[in-house]
Amino acid sequence: MRTLILLGILGATMSAPLIPQRLMSASNSNELLLNLNNAQLQPLQLQGPWIPPFPVILQQRQQQAQIPGLSQFSLANLDWFAGLVPNQRAFPGQVSFAQVTEARQLDPSQPQTSPQTQQGPNYVMPSLLSFKMPPEQGQMLQYYPVYMLLPWEQAQQTAAQSPPQTGQQLFEEQMPFYTELGYVPQQVEPVMPGGQQQPVFDPFLGTAPETAVMTAEVLPYFQKEMIQFKHSNGGIFIPSTSQKPSTTNVFTSTVDPTITPKVMEKKAKTDSLKEP
């Protein structure tokens, strides 16, 4: 049993890739590429390393780097061109802007002509934008904050800046902004020194505001009602324990004078029978 376990561990360690290998693309991993033109199976091909090569490897590959159909360039020159113009690539029929400027600097004796005549119809004329700002203009630019006043804040600001006034002018200046929308608030009149408030007729609404003044006829009525509900036991209602019902008030209030005397006699008899 131990030998089987040791053999399994040994096989796993031997199959593990101890030497760093190059990465393969997802399309090439664990499958073969089928060439449709020749109808033949091709073996796996390793892709180039993802990590950029070291300077020592650069020197070895400078002699081997060749582009089919073009002249031989060294990797150092290609990196230098890529550093100058990182976002432009040379296509057939189009020359990068860095190569055009370099050619003009090397041959200044040639007559300068328009780039459209030198290049093909697909040539895009490069444009230079200078983002550098002169120091004088940079000093003039300053930050100015922008404030936006709301309607109620603007009204408060105008009221604060205006000189102190009294009377109707001060009331007109401090009117809120919702009066413009059609809502007219009722103006509260000051209390008279005599202690009585005079009812004022509102000219806008056409109605007079309600007052709390009570007439002499209404006030005793409320006093009587309050006196009837008041109890001497502090709000505790105790019903009467007498079994004899009081029928005097009932007959006097509900009996119609048009009832005949016979009906009155019958009611009197029934009342006498009910009494113990």
UniProtKB/Swiss-Prot annotation:
Compartments in which it is found: Secreted; Cytoplasm; Nucleus
GO CC field: cytoplasm; extracellular region; nucleus
Pfam family, one: ODAM
Keywords: Biomineralization, Cytoplasm, Glycoprotein, Nucleus, Secreted, Signal
InterPro entries: Odam
The record's account of how the chain is modified after translation: O-glycosylated.
Signal peptide: 1-15
Any Gene Ontology biological process: biomineral tissue development
Glycosylation site residues: T101, T113, T117, S246, T247, T248, T252, S253, T254, T258, T260, T270, S272
Stretch list, region Interaction with ARHGEF5: 125-127
Function: Tooth-associated epithelia protein that probably plays a role in odontogenesis, the complex process that results in the initiation and generation of the tooth. May be incorporated in the enamel matrix at the end of mineralization process. Involved in the induction of RHOA activity via interaction with ARHGEF and expression of downstream factors such as ROCK. Plays a role in attachment of the junctional epithelium to the tooth surface.
Subunit description: Interacts (via C-terminus) with ARHGEF5.
Family: Belongs to the ODAM family.
Protein name: Odontogenic ameloblast-associated protein
Species the sequence originates in: Sus scrofa (Pig)
Lineage of origin: Eukaryota, Metazoa, Chordata, Craniata, Vertebrata
